[in-house]
Structures are given as C-alpha cells and as structure tokens.
UniProtKB/Swiss-Prot annotation:
It catalyses: chlorophyllide a + oxidized 2[4Fe-4S]-[ferredoxin] + 2 ADP + 2 phosphate = protochlorophyllide a + reduced 2[4Fe-4S]-[ferredoxin] + 2 ATP + 2 H2O. This is Light-independent protochlorophyllide reductase subunit B. The keyword Manganese does not apply. Binds 1 [4Fe-4S] cluster per heterodimer. The cluster is bound at the heterodimer interface by residues from both subunits. The keyword Metal-binding applies. It comes from Roseiflexus castenholzii (strain DSM 13941 / HLO8).
Length: 563
C-alpha cells in the first residue's frame, strides 16, 4: 500500500463504508485505531444527506494491545442495541489488519441479535473500488432468493451508491426514462436498499448496471444464477442513450417472451416523450453542437483522466458529439486499464505502429498526470479533483468528471451525467469551463480600463532542475535575467546583455529568458494558445543553445515548428 498526499482511491474499509452508508438496516463497524476513523468525517463532509453515517469505529489502543483486551464485542453489542440494524459488517482497517486477529471469533462472541458479516477487506490487495464492488457482490450472492418474475416489465438498477459521482441525479434520470417506457423499477441497490430488497433482485426482468466500478459483477451473477439479463452499457451522451434505450426495449421484449408475461411488446415512444416538458427534443446537444460557438470547439484539444466509466464516456462524448480533438486520456484504475484501452483504441492518437500507448496513461500517481497535462497543454482537461488542483497551477480550464471529488460535486440540484439530461449538463459544463477569452482579448486590445488585471507571467518563470531552482525573471520587474551556474554550483544572475547567446554551461542549468521585444511579440499571440507557444519556443531555444529569446529567435522557432 502506498502512502501519498493525495490518492485517487480511498482505502479498502472506505469502500466498505460506502456500501454500508448506502443501504438501510446495514451498519459497518471498523476494528481500527483512533487515526483510522477519518472515514466518518469524509461522509459527513461530502454527503448531502440528513442522516449520520452508518458506521462506527471500534477503537484499538496501545493499552488494549498491551493488556490483551479487545473492545470489538462490546462495540458490536452497543451498535446492536442502539441502531438495531439487520446486518452488521465488520472489517479491519489498514492498520489493524497487520495484527492478524480472528475477527470471526470476536464477532461471534458478541452474541448480537443482528446478523454479523466479517468482510476481508485486505488493503494490501484492494482499494476502495474493488472493496466496495466485492462487498456488494457478496451481499447479493448471500441474500438474493429465487423469486417469481414481476407481472409487468421491471428492472433492477445496480451501482448508485453513497459518495458516487452524481449518482443520485443519475438515478432520477434513469427513473424518468424507465417511466416513459412504462417499465417499473424492481430494486435500486445499494443506494436505499435493505436486505429484504436484495432478496427480491431475481424478480426483475432485467438488470441495469451502468457503472463498471460498482454493480456489474453482481448483475452478471444474477444473470448466471437466475437468468436475469444484464445491461451494462453506460448511456453517456445522446447517441449512446438512444442505443441504450433500443437495447433495453429489445432485452425486455425478449425476457417477456421467455417468461410469457408480455402481451404487447414494448416500443420506443416519440423522443419528445423523454424531454422535461414532453413536447421538445430530449436534448439540445445535437443542434447546439452545430452553432458557431460550439463549432469553434472542433479546434480545441482535450485530455481526459478518471475512472473507467466516466473516462470512456467523456472521451466519446467530446469527440463524437462536440467534435473536440482528444490528445490523451487515462485512468487510475489499473484493473480496468485493458477495457478502457480497448474502448478508446479509435479515439486516441496512435504512433506509427498503431499503438495508443503513448497517449494512454495508466497511473495512480497524480504527479504523473500533472506532468502529462503540462506537456500537452490542452484547452480543456476533464479529470478528478486532483487534476483540478494541477490545472489551477497551470492556468488551464478543468472540469471534474469522475471521483475523487470535493463538496462542489455533491450538489443539491439535479445534475446527472447519464441520459439525455446528462448530455445537456455535460455540454453546458464543457462550454462554461473551456475559455472563450473575450474578456482577455479586449484587455489585450484596449487595456485593463484601470481594473489592474495581472499581466501574463511570461517574464518570470521558475525552472527546477534536480534540487536547484533557476530564477529567470527579476521579481516585480520586467527585466529579464541571464541565469548561469557559478563555480560552486550556485546560480547567479545578470541583466546586462540581451543579445542571443550560446550557453556554455550545462544546458540543464539554464532556462532561456525573453528579451523585451520577444515578449511584446508573444503578447500578440491569442492568450489561449500563448502558453503552448511560449513552452515550444523555450524548448526550441534550449535545444539550440540560446540563452536569450529575441524576436529573431522567436520567428526562427515559429518557422521551424511549422507555425
């Protein structure tokens, strides 16, 4: 297990907490030291619900270990008496699992009324996503019972969960589309489900599981054990939603014929029936993408990074429906990397061998993603909360499309990602996130009108080489500084000469600086590509041994780079 400042996934017992907090009549008890009770505040901070998190930490202290005492049985009895759950899930945290204690024996000795399940959420083998999905699959296998099918077409919706990315809004959107088709919802799980609801899962005609991260393994098991077909596509975007609806109708008609329960086959109603007012088009994306504003996006470059479901869905939405260029994508879910790579094979830039490995990134290290973004400098980044932080430093527009997220992505309002409504939300977010730039263009042309906008930071940049930092601009002034290494390995500066120079010291220790006339030319470049032009010219100057970038070198670099 790797420790870091930021991690894309929570620990294994955080995944257990997500399932317990999603369900009714289920409570999680963590056998953990005081420091591992951070999971509770995460839910109280982010989850917009009036209830307390359905989890309790049974503290393990150094005194307990020294005296050979265990608090877990007493904690289980207290939870059983006060909360009165139907099921208590017990698991060790990433710290106490090192003790290798017999939690089964401890839980059995508590003698609780509620059923107790000890879940082996080993943090050295799994993290949040696999832990949550594994637990939900286990609960499905444990409690699902053979049931007669419902009298009318019905579906299960598996996957929405506590702290899921816009899951509550997605659920509303799915319910609306199903109601339009005349299809009932049998069970939604884990969000809002009880143990009794899990028993009723086999009664549905089909199962909808739109998220690869949670619910699809349980859906496949229901198909294998009870013959309930699973629909695992993610309706992200207008065209994927249309395909999803057609496949759902086909699946339910096949199930109805097999079950001999359907007298009149289901049919898709007019598309206007799926709109909010019942009279207009269900989504505005098809016509909006052809407006003058959005057609300009066909020249914009995008980078997408996140979990499996939202990365694939967002890449296809940006390219297929908004016409943007995808310069790179990736995921932090290593166990889903092969599926994501296969889905994006025709969407990412390939090398001469046809491989997309150079443009596809699989990593759990957020610094690697930040470096890739800095190298590509796209006009739009779609990522997680970590990419949002990285892009703020790089002054690049970023929209959050996948967990991990912060409080602003757990909204009270209706903001789905799935379905026709989700397509409109995504298009709006892209449009309001990507920079149009009219304000900055006007400031460049007419001045700031006394508003004191900051100048683009072209004359002061820091370059870090190993443990050394080279200041390439005088703080608070526009005077460029020629940086070079002194005899002791330090860095000295001089602003005396602005002519082009050949670097005689190690090129690793010198960053080219901009002469005033070159800076003036750079400011004439539209701001939304200015950063990329600056970086390319600086790279060209460093490769050719120029310590100072003059107007002549800027023109030379532009011609050499094909600009």
């Amino acid at each position: 297990m790797r420790l870091a400042l930021w991690m894309y996934q929570g620990t294994a017992h955080h995944g257990v907490g997500r399932i317990a907090n999603s369900m009714r009549g289920v409570h999680a008890v963590f056998h953990a030291p005081q420091g591992d009770d951070y999971v509770n505040p995460i839910f109280t901070m982010l989850e917009r619900t009036p209830d307390f998190p359905r989890m309790t930490t049974s503290i393990v202290s150094g005194r307990d270990l020294a005296q050979g005492t265990v608090r877990l049985p007493e904690t289980l009895r207290q939870v059983d008496a006060q909360v009165q759950p139907d099921l208590i899930i017990v698991c060790a945290s990433c710290s106490t699992i090192l003790l290798q204690e017999d939690l089964e024996r401890m839980a059995h000795s508590a003698g609780t009324r509620a059923e107790t399940l000890v879940y082996d959420a080993n943090p050295y083998r799994m993290q949040e996503v696999r832990s949550a999905d594994g637990l939900f699959t286990l609960l499905t296998q444990r409690f699902a019972r053979s049931q007669p099918p419902t009298a009318v077409p019905s579906v299960n919706i598996l996957g929405p969960a506590s702290l899921g990315f816009h899951n509550r809004s997605d659920l509303i959107c799915l319910r609306r589309m199903l109601a339009t088709l005349g299809v009932q919802v049998n069970v939604v799980a884990p969000l809002g489900a009880s143990i009794r609801d899990l028993e009723r899962l086999p009664a549905a005609w089909a199962t909808i599981a739109p998220y690869r991260e949670l619910g699809q393994n349980a859906a496949r098991w229901l198909d294998e054990q009870f013959g309930v077909p699973a629909l695992t596509d993610s309706p992200i975007g207008v065209q994927p939603t249309l395909r999803w609806l057609r496949r759902l109708v086909e699946t339910l008609n096949d199930a109805g014929e097999r079950l001999q329960r359907l007298t009149n086959p289901l049919r898709l109603p007019p598309l206007t029936a799926f709109s909010l007012d019942g009279m207009s088009a269900p989504s505005s994306v098809p016509w909006f993408a052809r407006t003058a504003d959005m057609e300009s996006y066909s020249m914009k470059r995008a980078f997408v990074f996140g979990d499996a479901t939202h990365t694939v869905g967002m890449v296809k939405f940006l390219r297929d429906e908004l016409g943007m260029q995808i310069v790179g994508a990736g995921t932090y879910l290593e166990h889903e990397a092969d599926w994501v790579r296969g889905e994006l094979q025709d969407y990412l830039p390939a090398d001469e061998t046809g491989s997309i490995d150079t443009s596809f990134l699989v990593t759990e290290v957020f610094q690697d993603v930040a470096r890739r973004i800095a190298d590509l400098t796209p006009e739009l980044v779609c990522g997680t909360q970590m990419e949002r932080h990285a892009c703020r430093k790089l002054d690049l527009p970023c929209m959050v499309i996948a967990p991990p997220t912060h409080i602003e992505n757990h909204l009270l309002s209706y903001r789905p990602v799935l379905g026709f409504d989700g397509a409109d939300v995504l298009a709006d977010t892209v449009y309001t996130t990507a920079t149009l730039g009219m304000e900055k263009h006007l400031i460049d042309m007419f001045g700031d009108a006394g508003l004191e906008y900051e100048e683009p930071r072209t004359e002061r940049r820091e370059a870090e080489f190993g443990n050394q930092k080279v200041e390439t601009g005088e703080p608070g002034t526009g005077a460029p500084v020629i940086a070079h290494a002194d005899s002791n390995g330090g860095v000295a500066g001089s602003s005396s000469t602005l002519a082009a120079q050949t670097v005689t010291a190690s090129p690793r220790l010198v960053t080219p600086v901009w002469a005033p006339e070159a800076q003036a030319m750079l400011k004439k470049v539209p701001f939304f590509v200015r950063g990329r032009v600056q970086k390319n010219v600086e790279r060209y100057a460093a490769q050719h041994g120029y310590a100072t970038i003059t107007a002549e070198i800027l023109v030379e670099a532009k011609e050499a780079l094909g600009g």
